[in-house]
Swiss-Prot record:
InterPro entries: PCRF (IPR005139), Pep_chain_release_fac_I (IPR000352), Pep_chain_release_fac_I_sf (IPR045853), Prokaryotic/Mito_RF (IPR050057), RF-1 (IPR004373). The modification N5-methylglutamine is found at residue 234. GO terms for cellular component: cytoplasm. It comes from Lactococcus lactis subsp. cremoris (strain MG1363). This is Peptide chain release factor 1. GO terms for molecular function: translation release factor activity, codon specific. Keywords: Cytoplasm, Methylation, Protein biosynthesis.
């Protein structure tokens, strides 16, 4: 472990020099790759440096206690310092083990969040809207930027489908566990008998793809320009600003009309399409390898039921880790930390178990 850590420190110092090299700075792709690598190593190096200081404290305290000639007060102080340092050493060793776990290369990326109303008609579409609000409030609490990319709104205010770009530090690492089927149990607003109905919305979390990672060739792209429409389908712009893009080999389609100009809609559309196409091909590769998608939490199947939101009992249950919280109202208002932290800890614990086998 320590040889690996010394190697990491050496690489971190090398990256610091490379990132100040004008030749590297002028190469955007390489600069971004090296910046990401440096950011990934930063916590490892800082924790290891702290660990070495603690080892030094232990060594110094033991040496002084072994020399003798100390008064009782000094001995007691050194013993307390030694005990505290040994406890800190154990904590840091566990932290280092976790930091050295194989890291998901997408953890530092922004995400495209896609939510679809699935089984349950209008009620499923309304629940998709509830989930969207939950993720938006959570993003705001983290200081992340939340931007609607594409929305297909139903007549009663829900969403058949909605996509959002969430930008900021550690977005993917915290929200990657949200992909899957989310089930709601509640009395719909349209229900006159007061019966509880079950509906489902699906969530897909995709790491945002950088331009240098994925470029769609023009021959594979069809672009349609049309007039943006508002509620009821009426045209709201005299100038055609809405953009529809289709990736011909896969049939993946995106439509963008949120912005006022055609160029801004184009930029957002190509960003969304790049991410969806990249994710499509990545999923095919992972399916071929028959590997779990992204983590050990759940099967990685996008149709897997991962969580139930029970309104009558104010209960949220995450089925993958057996976590039940009587805090539905709080969680739907964006206070998701307890759920997300539990998923991260579970994932890390499972990976450590695999490593120690």
């Amino acid at each position: 472990m320590f040889d690996q850590l010394e190697s990491i420190v050496g690489r971190y110092e090398e990256l610091g020099e490379l990132l100040s090299d004008p030749e590297v700075v002028s190469d955007t792709k390489r600069f971004m790759e090296l910046s990401r690598e440096e950011a990934d190593l930063r916590d490892k190096v800082a924790t290891y440096n702290e660990y070495k200081k603690v080892l030094e404290t232990i060594s110094d305290s033991e040496e002084m206690l072994g020399e003798g000639g100390l008064d009782d007060e000094m001995k007691e102080m050194l013993k307390e310092e030694l005990s505290s340092a040994k406890s800190q050493k154990e904590v840091l060793e566990e932290e280092i083990k976790i930091l050295l776990l194989p890291k998901d290369p997408n953890d530092g990326k922004n995400i495209i969040l896609e939510i679809r109303g699935a089984a349950g008609g209008d009620e499923a579409a309304l629940f998709a809207g509830d989930l969207l609000n939950m993720y938006q409030h959570f993003s705001e609490s983290q200081g992340w930027k939340f931007e609607i990319m594409e929305a297909n709104i139903t007549g009663i205010g829900g969403y058949k489908e909605v996509s959002a770009l969430i930008s900021g530090p550690s977005v993917y690492s915290k929200l990657k566990y949200e992909s899957g089927a989310h089930r709601v149990q509640r009395v719909p607003v349209t229900e006159t008998q007061g019966r509880v109905h079950t509906s489902t919305a699906t969530v897909l979390v995709m790491p945002e793809v950088e331009e240098f990672e994925m470029t769609i060739e023009q021959k594979d792209l069809r672009v349609d320009i049309y007039h943006a429409s508002g509620a009821g389908g009426q045209n709201v712009n005299k100038v055609a600003t809405a953009v529809r893009m289709v990736h011909l080999p896969t049939g993946i389609k995106v439509e963008m009309q949120e912005e006022r100009t055609q160029q801004k809609n184009r930029d957002k559309a190509i960003k969304l399409l790049n991410t969806k196409v990249f994710d499509y091909y990545q999923q095919i590769e992972l399916d071929k390898q028959n590997t779990e998608r992204k983590s050990t939490v759940g099967t990685g199947d996008r149709s897997e039921r991962i969580r139930t939101y029970n309104f009558p009992q104010n209960r949220v249950t995450d089925h993958r880790i057996g976590l039940t919280l009587q805090k539905l109202d709080s969680i739907l208002s964006g206070k998701m930390d307890e759920v997300i932290d539990a998923l991260i800890v579970y994932d890390q614990t499972k990976k450590l178990e695999e490593l120690n086998k």
